[in-house]
Amino acid sequence: MVIVVDHPLVQHKLTKLRDKSTEPKEFRELLSEISSLMLYEVTRNLPTKEVEVETPLGIAKGKVLNNKDLAIVPILRAGLVMAEGMLRILPSAKVGHIGLYRDPNTLKPVQYYTKLPEDIDKREVVVVDPMLATGGSAIAAISILKTKGVKNIKFVCIISAPEGIEALKNSHPDVDIYTAAIDEKLNDHGYIIPGLGDAGDRLFGTK
């Protein structure tokens, strides 16, 4: 399933994120804020349990998340800022890291780092990466998680291309995709058009 998060706040911040005049500091803040907002939709069906708490005036019944069962796995490096934004909402979630870069010649992902919680196979995992372009990095990261026994995976990005969505759905049809926008297409270099450029470079001021 593909879920487009079209909340007005998300779309407002996404428009500013796309603007080429947005500086790295503001770009990081916007990406973090959008990720926090998108997490509301991603966690809509998380299980809760009923509890009682004592207020200053009596006993109230309430519900709490069992978010100890959640893990956030950013694809390095651009996914880090998304994970930080989500952790502001769910600070008790565990975090893993998968390092992938896209070979500029083949456009295929190359793995260079993986560090995951020991109990990752018992957790619902949210994989985050700002851009779903060719789909190669997302497919590779999810494949790594599945080899570790993870069964419940969601993928969250800010901008996606139709080609990337199709590739990810074909490789991992059991994984729901959450995105703030589906753009027009990929160019010959594998970049999303109109997109926002290279998310990692814009985040960290590199070229």
Swiss-Prot record:
Cofactor note as given: Binds 1 Mg(2+) ion per subunit. The magnesium is bound as Mg-PRPP.
An annotated GO BP: UMP salvage
Keywords: Allosteric enzyme, Glycosyltransferase, GTP-binding, Magnesium, Nucleotide-binding, Transferase
A Pfam cross-reference name: UPRTase
A single cellular component GO annotation: cytoplasm
Residues engaged in binding uracil: I192, G197, D198, A199
EC number of this enzyme: 2.4.2.9
Pathway in which this enzyme or protein is active: Pyrimidine metabolism; UMP biosynthesis via salvage pathway; UMP from uracil: step 1/1
Reactions catalysed, as given in the entry: UMP + diphosphate = 5-phospho-alpha-D-ribose 1-diphosphate + uracil
Cofactor: Mg(2+)
InterPro entries linked: PRibTrfase_dom, PRTase-like, Upp_B, UPRTase/APRTase, Ura_phspho_trans
Gene3D superfamilies for this protein: 3.40.50.2020
Molecular function in Gene Ontology: GTP binding; magnesium ion binding; uracil phosphoribosyltransferase activity
Activity modulation comment: Allosterically activated by GTP.
Protein residues bound to 5-phospho-alpha-D-ribose 1-diphosphate: R77, R102, D129, P130, M131, L132, A133, T134, G135, G136, S137, D198
Disulfide bonds: none
Free-text function comment from the UniProt entry: Catalyzes the conversion of uracil and 5-phospho-alpha-D-ribose 1-diphosphate (PRPP) to UMP and diphosphate.
Family under the similarity heading: Belongs to the UPRTase family.
NCBIfam families according to UniProt: PRK00129.1 (NF001097), upp (TIGR01091)
HAMAP family with a match to the protein in the record: Upp_B
Protein name: Uracil phosphoribosyltransferase
The species this protein was found in: Dictyoglomus turgidum (strain DSM 6724 / Z-1310)
Gene for this chain: upp
